[in-house]
């Protein structure tokens, strides 16, 4: 079925998130209490809410988006390119620019969004943060009242599950199993908060995020049994 999808109709994406504040003590008292309540079932072995705040970026209610990277295929005759770009800066601006992209270029029923674990993380996270900032949801993220088959979302992790709802496979593992080579990653997801707040190296995070977009596209190609992208076909714009 996925072989019938026109690759030019898909927007591949990945987001990077961090806690809304650099540390727990910068939260107001109400937010501290809410975090303590929210995290108590995840915390183990006597870990305090303050210590566990390192992971707050996972939740849209306590985190924020620092970059959205996207990629899309373009065909000119027999020539194939995969263009990658990123939105970064203040979160409201990131979200507005991303919304403009969707509203302008990916607004038709034929268009699809694709991410790795996108249905459980990236897509709802973006939608929730848009609502927080009073940004009208673009059609591709507005799921209210839609039937499951009307939702234009693809998820490489879900495609790999083959109905096994318990199965979780990281993008890195999938790429390795499917024989997809990639440059050595400079960082991983657990390091993003420190690189953002301590090192203040957003460019490093953007490179990591863009690599995940490229890898997601490569995984999707393998799931279709298509040829993988060559380095010269990838254009960062």
Where are each of the predicted segments found?
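Conserved RNase H-like, two-metal-ion catalytic cores of nucleic-acid enzymes
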Residues: 1-100, 104
């Amino acid at each position: 079925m996925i072989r019938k999808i026109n690759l030019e109709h898909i927007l591949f994406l990945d987001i990077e998130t961090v806690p809304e504040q650099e540390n727990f003590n910068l939260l107001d008292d109400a937010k501290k209490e809410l975090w303590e309540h929210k995290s108590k079932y995840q915390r183990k072995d006597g870990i305090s809410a303050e210590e566990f705040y390192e992971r707050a970026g996972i939740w849209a209610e306590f985190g924020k988006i620092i970059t959205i990277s996207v990629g899309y295929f373009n065909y000119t005759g027999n020539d194939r390119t995969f263009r990658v770009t990123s939105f970064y800066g203040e979160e409201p601006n990131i979200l507005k620019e991303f919304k403009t992209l969707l509203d302008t270029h990916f607004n038709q029923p034929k268009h699809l969004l694709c991410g790795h674990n996108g249905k459980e993380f990236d897509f709802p996270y973006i939608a929730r943060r848009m609502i927080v900032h009073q940004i009208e949801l673009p059609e591709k993220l507005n799921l209210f009242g839609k039937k499951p088959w009307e939702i234009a979302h693809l998820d490489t992790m879900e495609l790999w599950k083959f109905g096994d709802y318990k199965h979780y496979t990281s993008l890195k593992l999938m790429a390795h199993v499917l024989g997809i080579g990639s440059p050595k990653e400079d960082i991983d997801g657990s390091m993003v908060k420190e690189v953002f707040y301590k090192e203040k190296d957003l460019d490093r995070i953007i490179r990591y995020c863009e690599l995940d977009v490229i890898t997601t596209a490569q995984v999707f190609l393998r799931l279709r049994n298509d040829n993988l992208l060559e380095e010269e076909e990838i254009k960062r714009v």
